[in-house]
Amino acid sequence: MAVPKRKKSKSRRNMHRSHHAIKPKNIVVCATTGEFMLPHNIAVDNSYKGKRVFIKQKAE
């Protein structure tokens, strides 16, 4: 089992954790609806990059 030879100082501990912060999500505005959404996802109205992707069919 690996055991540290020396105690890691508060400064070095915090420098090690500097990349652990939560980054803000990238939010874009939908071209068709104008709503906020995550990039590379289908919008609420089933459009992607301004084009309809899924067309709802009537239940038979």
Curated annotation (Swiss-Prot):
GO cellular component: large ribosomal subunit
Gene3D superfamilies: Single helix bin
Pfam family, one: Ribosomal_L32p
Domain of life: Bacteria
Keywords: Ribonucleoprotein, Ribosomal protein
Example GO molecular function: structural constituent of ribosome
Region: Disordered, residue numbers: 1-23
Record's keyword annotation contains Nucleotidyltransferase: no
Keyword Ribosomal protein among UniProt keywords: yes
A Gene Ontology BP annotation from the UniProt entry: translation
PANTHER family referenced in this protein's UniProt entry, alphabetically: 50S RIBOSOMAL PROTEIN L32, LARGE RIBOSOMAL SUBUNIT PROTEIN BL32
Family membership: Belongs to the bacterial ribosomal protein bL32 family.
Protein known as: Large ribosomal subunit protein bL32
